[in-house]
Design a protein with these regions (language model features):
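Extracellular/periplasmic catalytic domains that process cell-envelope and extracellular macromolecules
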Residues: 11-14, 32-37, 69-71, 115-116, ...
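Pocket-edge positions in alpha/beta enzyme catalytic cores
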Residues: 95-98, 129, 172, 202
């Protein structure tokens, strides 16, 4: 889980915007005492099939949506490309973003579901995108934003922690900071995940690396669109 600290233009800097991720199995008590401090509740997560059908969480999340509204917090649907084993599937991403009919199906199904359940926003959290799918993914986000905004739904997209445009690696090459910053209403900078189970020993979010990610993001994306992720 992570917190999202949102940057806004100068005139809003006295106003703190704090969002947070939560699973449907979160403790009722923990959620209720946390919601008064949150601007947005990012419910993790919804999946999809290669044909564009939405896959809902195994556990009911309507109670979370209801609790969010009772605390003036916006509920956000987090969309992830998980396979049957619960891990990110880049092949599923490829199948979706290169198929216009699947995209049309998914967006239509999401809009129907989100209006029915009361979601106020969509968070697109796709990771390990093939570099060959970079532009197609950006176009997918742009189309989601265009369609969702017609219904008053805000769209954000999660960005892997890049520090340059030519950064190598499966986690980075499929994400176009500038393109996605223009395509979505806002972006979540994943400034963390530097140190993890299979990496060299280091902090999860070293301050110097966090600073580099933010500085690169600011060179590509308007400040008002940037949300800073904290692990």
């Amino acid at each position: 889980q992570a917190l999202l600290v949102e940057f806004r233009p100068n005139q809003y800097r006295t106003r703190r915007v704090i969002n947070g991720y939560a699973y449907p199995f979160v403790s009722n008590y923990v959620l209720r005492v946390t919601l008064p401090y949150l601007s947005g509740l990012y419910i993790f997560s919804y999946g999809f099939t290669k044909e564009g059908e939405v896959v809902s969480p195994a556990l009911d999340d309507q109670w979370m949506i209801n609790e969010a509204y009772e605390n003036d917090t916006k509920p956000v649907l987090t969309l992830t490309p998980f396979d049957e084993n619960g891990v990110f599937s880049n092949n599923l991403i490829t199948a979706l973003v290169n198929n216009e009919q699947a995209i049309e199906n998914l967006i239509g199904n999401l809009i129907y579901l989100m209006n029915e359940k009361g979601f106020a926003g969509l968070d697109i959290d796709f990771e390990y995108i093939y570099k060959e799918d970079r532009d197609a993914f950006t176009s997918f986000v742009a189309e989601c934003t265009r369609r969702m905004n017609e219904y008053g739904i805000w769209v954000s997209v999660a960005l892997a922690p890049k520090t340059s445009s030519d950064q190598k690696g499966l986690l980075y090459e499929g994400k176009d900071y500038g393109g996605l910053g223009a395509a979505a209403n806002s972006v979540l900078l994943m400034t963390y995940e530097w140190g993890y189970t299979y990496s060299s020993p280091m902090a999860v979010a070293p301050i110097n690396k966090v600073r580099q990610v933010i500085e690169y993001a600011l060179s590509q994306i308007p400040e008002a669109k940037i949300d800073m992720g904290i692990p």
